[in-house]
From Swiss-Prot:
Superkingdom, natural source: Bacteria
PANTHER family named in the record: ACETYL-COENZYME A CARBOXYLASE CARBOXYL TRANSFERASE SUBUNIT BETA, CHLOROPLASTIC
Positions of C4-type zinc fingers: 33-54
Sequence similarity: Belongs to the AccD/PCCB family.
Pathway: Lipid metabolism; malonyl-CoA biosynthesis; malonyl-CoA from acetyl-CoA: step 1/1
Species for this entry: Limosilactobacillus fermentum (strain NBRC 3956 / LMG 18251) (Lactobacillus fermentum)
A Pfam family this chain is assigned to: Carboxyl_trans
Keyword Transferase: yes
Subunit structure: Acetyl-CoA carboxylase is a heterohexamer composed of biotin carboxyl carrier protein (AccB), biotin carboxylase (AccC) and two subunits each of ACCase subunit alpha (AccA) and ACCase subunit beta (AccD).
Protein name (Swiss-Prot/TrEMBL): Acetyl-coenzyme A carboxylase carboxyl transferase subunit beta
């Protein structure tokens, strides 16, 4: 069988065979850690989706995190529906696609949860939903989460993962920063505990508001934590910044984070903090 044509090029038959073989290989068969560049066989990764080399936690959905984080959970405000107040081109289609992919009505899951004998209110931002962007329904759900916790004297745990305010909703998206912060202040005034867990990525308006307002601020290893992105900083300052400038470990070193916790330890750490660091209900 002739492999090459006269001009020393692969025959069309072999090119087509290569394309057919490539099409049979799943896109998610291999994963590359964005931090240490280690190539991982996806099927060998555990339920926590962490890199065995550097501990980086890959971006996961809210439902994936729920599966190993809590013993039980009941969702809240699932009927709220995101609108398109500015008639932004293509936004409705993007929303529908994100809702189908994530199974959520917007970029955050909220509800009442339990770990062991500790009851608390839980919020998990989902980076698979338009990169966890902060929209009006996201802000409304988190606000209601804190209001419910204040009313029922419960601590709140919030996992942040966001690219910032959602541009398709304009100023109404930015308003959520102040609205959520007000609900947090009322929760704090009631003497209740608020724990934040920063995951990759936590940036923009979320970092500038409720992500940094916790009584205890935890972070996952190697998580990106910052306000503006690396490229924006470098273009604005005309200075090349260190590769690890916005890594959680560096943010911890400068005092903005209290502790870094692996996903494997999050459940026990949160239970301990809420049991001994928060107001107890009789």
């Amino acid at each position: 069988m002739k492999l090459y044509k006269a001009k020393n090029t692969l025959s069309e038959r072999h090119v087509q065979a290569d394309r057919t073989a490539d099409a049979k290989v799943p896109d998610d068969l291999w994963r590359t850690c964005p931090k240490c560049q280690r190539t991982l066989f996806a099927a060998q990764m555990d339920e926590y989706a962490t890199c065995p080399g550097c501990g980086y936690g890959f971006r996961i959905s809210a439902n994936q995190r729920l599966s190993w984080l809590v013993d039980s959970a009941v969702p809240m405000d699932t009927a709220l529906q995101t609108q398109d107040p500015l008639n932004f081109p293509g936004y409705e289609g993007k929303l529908k696609k994100a809702q189908e992919k994530s199974g959520l009505n917007d970029s955050v899951w909220t509800g009442r949860a339990r770990i062991g004998d500790v009851d608390f209110n839980l919020g998990i931002m989902d980076p698979t939903f338009i990169m966890g962007s902060l929209g009006t329904i996201t802000g409304e759900k988190i606000t209601r989460l804190f209001e419910d916790a204040t009313k029922n004297q419960r601590p709140v745990v919030l996992f942040t993962a966001s690219g910032g305010a959602r541009m398709q909703e304009g100023i109404m998206s930015l308003m959520q920063m102040a609205k959520v912060s007000t609900a947090i202040a009322e929760h704090d005034a009631a003497g209740l505990l608020y724990i934040v867990v920063l995951t990759d990525p936590t940036t923009g308006g979320v970092t500038a508001s409720f992500a940094m307002e916790g009584d205890v601020i935890l972070a996952e290893p190697r998580a990106l934590v910052g306000f503006a992105g690396r490229r924006v900083i470098e273009q604005t300052t005309h200075t090349e910044i260190p590769a690890d400038l916005q890594d959680a470990e560096n943010v911890l070193k400068h005092g903005f984070i209290d502790h870094i916790v692996t996903r494997q330890d999050e459940k026990t750490t949160l239970a301990w903090l809420m049991k001994y660091g928060g107001k107890q209900n009789d």
